[in-house]
């Protein structure tokens, strides 16, 4: 297999990143359609983040095609009174998931956070991946977020 290259994202990559984000969304939330307007807003946010020093946006390329991305940041966490690193999204095309590329990108995100002065990292993990993260020895389960449809009537009453 030809080498996969990771690099900082550029503004021109943001449309492709948004398409990969939509793929990721469709995998993890097939029951909720991501609106085109939301994708357009995401492109705007990604373009802005490319030039911000506290934002982390990288892409993985194979044969000149973007096959994955990782998105994170560093910001002050008031409750903990410290600088924290965040990893919001990681997505790799299915045919490349066996390569440990996501793991390598996450490790790079952590190292970048350390260099920015962060002393703790937070990772948004999708429900299908939680079991793998819980087994990692260096990670503690910090918070769980649930979502519910506020429009649809539910037959289950609490």
Predicted regions and their residues:
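A short beta-loop-alpha structural element at the N-terminal edge
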Residues: 4-19
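Conserved GNAT-fold acetyl-CoA-binding loop/helix
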Residues: 25-45
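A short helix-loop-beta-strand connector motif used in the catalytic cores of GNAT acetyltransferases and
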Residues: 47-59, 86
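Conserved beta-strand in the GNAT
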Residues: 59, 65-74, 86
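Conserved acetyl-CoA binding element of GNAT-fold acetyltransferases
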Residues: 82-94, 144-147
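Conserved acetyl-CoA-binding loop-helix of GNAT-fold acetyltransferases
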Residues: 89-92, 98-111
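Conserved GNAT acetyl-CoA-binding A-motif
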Residues: 113-126
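Conserved catalytic-core motifs of GNAT/GCN5-like acyltransferases
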Residues: 124-128, 135, 140-154
